[in-house]
Design a protein with these regions (language model features):
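Oxidative protein folding and maturation machinery
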Residues: 1-54
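Short loop/turn microsegments at loop-to-beta-strand junctions
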Residues: 41-42, 63-64, 140-141
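Short acidic-hydrophobic, aromatic-tinged amphipathic segments that line or gate anion-handling sites
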Residues: 47, 120-125, 156
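Short active-site neighborhood of thiol/selenol oxidoreductases, capturing the structured segment around
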Residues: 54-84, 95-99
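Extended hydrophobic-aromatic, low-complexity segments
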Residues: 55-56, 66, 74-79, 106-109, ...
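Structural microenvironment flanking redox-active thiols in thiol-disulfide oxidoreductases
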Residues: 77-115, 126-133
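Thiol/disulfide oxidoreductase modules built on the thioredoxin-like
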Residues: 127-170
């Protein structure tokens, strides 16, 4: 939310003659304003490694973790082993959907990170999540935690903030 306030303030500071800069801030504000905590996350089609297509909203679980990642991303290569080793992310109350959101599906098929059997390892056909701008993904991996109704609980979370949230909600059960 702080970034949204910053963008709005920047737009107010611009004079009317700076149309290109104003449009840039307006675009960023639209992107950041998508899938806000408390809103229902944008649904999308994904395809798993077996070629089976499903909708994100059809994943039935008390909680769903979306991990938007790219096998060629250096930060993803560093972060994925930590996520894979996290026992909280193996809990049965949590469905994990590791998603490659871009269009180079051949690269995704040949460079995938070994994903636990319980997780869903998938891509979006034709990279529609990335190309349609349905999720604001300024860097990867990007973590979104959703509830059973697919409402956003955490947006672009860090691993630490995700862990803290999950410890709080999963230990209450």
């Amino acid at each position: 939310m702080t970034y949204m306030h910053f963008l709005r303030a920047q737009m107010e500071l611009l004079n009317d003659g700076d149309l290109a800069e104003r449009e840039r801030y307006a675009f960023l504000l639209r992107m950041v304003g998508q899938n806000l905590p408390g809103s229902v996350a944008r649904d999308f089609v994904f395809e798993d490694r077996k070629g089976v297509r499903s909708r994100m909203h059809s994943v039935a679980s008390p909680f769903t973790l979306l991990i938007f990642n790219d096998p060629e991303c250096e930060t993803c290569k560093e972060m994925m082993p930590k996520l894979l080793a996290d026992p909280l992310l193996q809990r049965e109350e949590l469905a994990v959907l590791a998603i490659y959101p871009d269009s180079d599906t051949e690269m995704w098929k040949t460079h995938g990170t070994p994903i636990p059997e319980r997780w869903i390892d998938a891509c979006t056909p034709n990279g529609e999540v990335m190309h349609n701008g349905w999720y604001y993904l300024p860097a990867m991996p990007s973590l979104y935690l959703l509830d059973a109704q697919k409402r956003v609980l955490l947006k672009d979370a860090t691993h630490d903030s995700l862990r803290q949230y999950l410890i709080g909600v999963l230990n209450r059960k």
